[in-house]
């Protein structure tokens, strides 16, 4: 095995081990929750499948124009 192949194997193994450790970490849940809160859809904005409504709001509709909106609960 040459140096480049050894480096690639080491890099892949470190990535796999890091992914396993991150999956078991409580910190990951907090970071993902923070990420979700930053991309949620606020009140009176159109709902989207990729971006859920923020806490305290829910997707309601569709309105007369066939678009659903996040509304305060």
From Swiss-Prot:
GO terms for molecular function: potassium channel regulator activity; toxin activity. Its main location: secreted. Expressed by the venom gland. The record marks 39 as: Important for the neurotoxic activity. Keywords: Calcium-activated potassium channel impairing toxin, Cleavage on pair of basic residues, Disulfide bond, Ion channel impairing toxin, Knottin, Neurotoxin, Potassium channel impairing toxin, Secreted, Signal, Toxin. The keyword Secreted applies. InterPro entries: Toxin_16 (IPR012499). The keyword Secreted applies. Residues 1-22 form the signal peptide. PROSITE patterns: J_ACTX (PS60020). Pfam families: Toxin_16. The record marks 45-46, 50-51, 69 as: Critical for the neurotoxic activity. The presence of a 'disulfide through disulfide knot' structurally defines this protein as a knottin. Belongs to the neurotoxin 11 (kappa toxin) family. This excitatory toxin inhibits insect calcium-activated potassium (KCa) channels (Slo-type). This is Lambda-hexatoxin-Hmo1d.
